[in-house]
């Protein structure tokens, strides 16, 4: 797979708490130049990006990020504001405590509630695999499928681990046919980019892809 094809699968990501407007502009410009699938950025920058770049960029943002603890009502409010500001894609974090309490139906209902708000736009569900057992991961595959979300996503990039090949294989076995996979966290080499796409990931969340494919040494998410 050539570099251009790889980058069409990349959500060019900048979610560091110290991200400046100059940092954000850099990834916006790179997204336009290299035709990435989207940029994934903090919600506070959505309006400014939309005002500056218009429809040249597909904007993704995060909700309930990175811990997932906020209430469903809070996540709905975040989502509504993000969409009003110009986001086209929402990456939400589930309440991991609900998973640990085996309140799987509650997680499903929260995802469903956000999908109702998102409508025809894209909802990706971050399940933070590094904290879950295999049983819990399978339960979340079912929850994401039943709730009608568009993607299941491995990680925030702020947890104790990121995407693994084993988790991608597990997802493929247990998600429904309409659910796609996004790998994020630890996608740090060109080999990783190719491996996850070849394994069936439709999206990759990383800040490193453009630099890696340009042959640069990079650090980040």
Curated annotation (Swiss-Prot):
Its EC number is 4.1.2.4. The active site is at 91 (proton donor/acceptor), 153 (schiff-base intermediate with acetaldehyde), 182 (proton donor/acceptor). CDD domains: DeoC. Pathway: Carbohydrate degradation; 2-deoxy-D-ribose 1-phosphate degradation; D-glyceraldehyde 3-phosphate and acetaldehyde from 2-deoxy-alpha-D-ribose 1-phosphate: step 2/2. The keyword Ribosomal protein does not apply. Keywords: Cytoplasm, Lyase, Schiff base. Its main location: cytoplasm. SMART domains: DeoC. Belongs to the DeoC/FbaB aldolase family. DeoC type 1 subfamily. This is Deoxyribose-phosphate aldolase. The lineage of its organism: Bacteria, Bacillati, Bacillota, Clostridia, Eubacteriales.
């Amino acid at each position: 797979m050539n570099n251009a094809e790889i980058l069409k699968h990349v959500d060019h990501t900048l979610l560091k708490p110290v991200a400046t407007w100059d940092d954000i502009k850099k990834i916006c410009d790179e997204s336009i130049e290299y035709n990435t699938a989207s940029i994934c950025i903090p919600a506070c920058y959505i309006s400014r990006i939309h005002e500056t770049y218009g429809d040249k960029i597909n904007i993704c943002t995060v909700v309930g990020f990175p811990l997932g603890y906020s209430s469903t009502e809070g996540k709905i409010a975040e989502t509504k504001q993000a969409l009003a500001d110009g986001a086209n894609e929402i990456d939400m974090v589930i309440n991991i405590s609900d998973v640990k309490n085996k309140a799987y139906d509650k997680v499903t209902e929260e995802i469903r509630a956000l999908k109702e708000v998102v409508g025809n736009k894209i909802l990706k569900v971050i399940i933070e695999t590094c904290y879950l057992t295999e049983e819990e991961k399978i339960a979340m595959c079912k929850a994401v499928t039943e709730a009608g979300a568009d993607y299941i996503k491995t990680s925030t990039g702020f947890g104790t681990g990121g995407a693994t090949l084993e988790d991608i294989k597990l997802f493929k076995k247990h998600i429904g046919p309409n659910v796609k996979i996004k790998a994020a966290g630890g996608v740090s080499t060109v080999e990783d980019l190719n491996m996850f796409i070849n394994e069936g990931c439709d999206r990759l969340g990383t800040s490193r892809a453009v630099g890696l494919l340009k042959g640069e040494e990079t650090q980040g998410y």
